[in-house]
Amino acid sequence: MAYLGVDTSRIAGTQPLEMLLVSSGSPDPHSTIIIDPRTGVSSWSYKGSELQGASTGLVEPLGHDGEHVVITTKERPLVHVLAVHPKDRFHQKCVLPGPVSAIVSDNSGHFVFMSIKRQLYCWLLSTGELLSVIDAHYQNITKIVISDDDSMIFTASKDGAVHGYLVTDLVSADRDHTVAPFRKWASHTLSISDLKITNGSNPRVLSAGADHIACLHSISMDSVILKASSDRPLTACAIDPAETRIFIGTEVGNIAQINLFQLAPEERDLLVQAGDEHNTKFRVLNGHSDEISRLAINTDGTLLASGDASGKYCIWEISSHQCLKVSTMRSVINTLRFIPFWKTISGGEHVAKFRPVWDLKREPTKCDRFAIEVSTEFNSDQKHWNDVIEETIDQLLLESGSKSSAQLQWDAEGPARNEAAKAEKAAENTIKNIITLGDDEDDAPEVGNQRRKSGKKNKKNRKNQKKNDFEAAVIEKKQVEPIVIDDEEEVNSSLQKKFDALKAENEKLKEINKQMYEFVAKEIVDSEK
């Protein structure tokens, strides 16, 4: 192991922003490691005891959190999933219809896409269901890539074709129609060895094949916008995040750099002599003596990682073309990618947010199972979990066409609501009749006679009479009010008894409903186990 031009003492105590995941196809222990690209120091390694002597195939992280990784076995239909955290002993394995040739996961880690021969499989990891299986190509699939927004998947195969699929079509529960690619490119005549996709809303797809050609495809234009022909078969490719540089690797270990910003607008077909070390137009990096198997560029486009078939991998500084680190492993480099710094690597306290169900089905299903995601924080409130279970069961009842618990409870409380409405209406009518009788209309003739008198005395008498009439009406109302209150209390007392009986019955139904939900939830959990 060699470190060239790096002062490791200055950066030894700082936390890196990104790490480098390296894996070789060797059955030896610690064939999968995670290193700091600045120093080359290994921060995590996988012993490989669960593989039982099988050679490591591909290594794919589930999501961007780095809680779990998927490891395939070379030439065997076995796929393993294990936890990255050193104290987490989670490990499961599954037998698939055949060896996996390519694998990719979405950013959440809930979906995984694998290729077996010429078919593309899509699994939902919260239940283990196989959502779809499509015949993507005429020959075996070699590479799968997914866009950074998880909306598109592109596949490459030995037939020289690149196909693009919408993720929504692959994960859809509709099995009545055949999933068709929305993009088809046949820009190669031989097998495609590598496939890369850029970031952003308008990504580009870079492919390299054994026909000595590398093609840059535009998804929006649905065409090839750049074609580079080499003097040697191409085995790997990479493009930086800014889409300014392209790197292509050959079968003899040379890496050619193409600066896109130096090309003229009319230059669409390039001839690259990757074997010429004195090439002035395209810079050639010479650090390998065997076939380049993997190329990767970090997030800011300053570092290039390369691995070959002999197990040697290098880290280059792109601006100066200087090799910063050289190391070797015991077999071909199958996985080489830059990853963000995972908190699970440090070994601190960590609780997994999600556990994949690795009982992967072999036949497509119709989403007849459901899952409740595990909460990251424990909630001891029993009412909270009862509400969660009730909401889940209500959703299932609505999907099946049945009434939910809220609708059943509303129907059960219907008679009580009708009785309450009738009682309220009867009480309003009683009060209205009593107020009408208290208006003291019997004194109207006397008041009318007094109004027919004239003079100031008559006016004063009328005022006094009105005042006396008003006081008499108030007194009469006060005398009647106790009778109204007594009648209302009798009505309310009768209604209160009915309400109490209905309330007790309602509480009893709620308790039965709660017991039913707890029983159903327990049955679901036991069936999952």
Swiss-Prot record:
The gene is pro-1. It comes from Caenorhabditis elegans. GO terms for cellular component: nuclear pre-replicative complex; nucleolus; nucleoplasm; rixosome complex. Keywords: Coiled coil, Developmental protein, Differentiation, Gonadal differentiation, Nucleus, Repeat, Ribosome biogenesis, rRNA processing, WD repeat. Its main location: nucleus. GO terms for biological process: DNA-templated DNA replication; germ cell development; gonad development; gonadal mesoderm development; rRNA processing. Residues 450-465 have a biased composition (Basic residues). Belongs to the WD repeat IPI3/WDR18 family. SMART domains: WD40. Component of the PELP1 complex involved in the nucleolar steps of 28S rRNA maturation and the subsequent nucleoplasmic transit of the pre-60S ribosomal subunit. Required for processing ITS2 sequences from rRNA intermediates during 26S rRNA maturation. Required in the soma to promote normal proliferation and prevent germline tumor formation. Gene3D superfamilies: YVTN repeat-like/Quinoprotein amine dehydrogenase. This is Pre-rRNA-processing protein pro-1. It is found in: Nucleus, Nucleolus; Nucleus, Nucleoplasm. InterPro entries: WD40/YVTN_repeat-like_dom_sf (IPR015943), WD40_repeat_dom_sf (IPR036322), WD40_rpt (IPR001680), WDR18/Ipi3/RID3 (IPR045227). Disruption phenotype: Worms exhibit defects in rRNA processing which disrupt hermaphrodite gonadogenesis and germline proliferation and which are associated with a reduction in sheath cell number. Component of the PELP1 complex, composed of at least PELP1, TEX10 and WDR18. The complex interacts with pre-60S ribosome particles. It comes from the Eukaryota. Residues 436-470 are annotated as: Disordered. SUPFAM superfamilies: WD40 repeat-like. WD repeats lie at residues 136-175, 287-326. Residues 416-518 form a coiled coil.
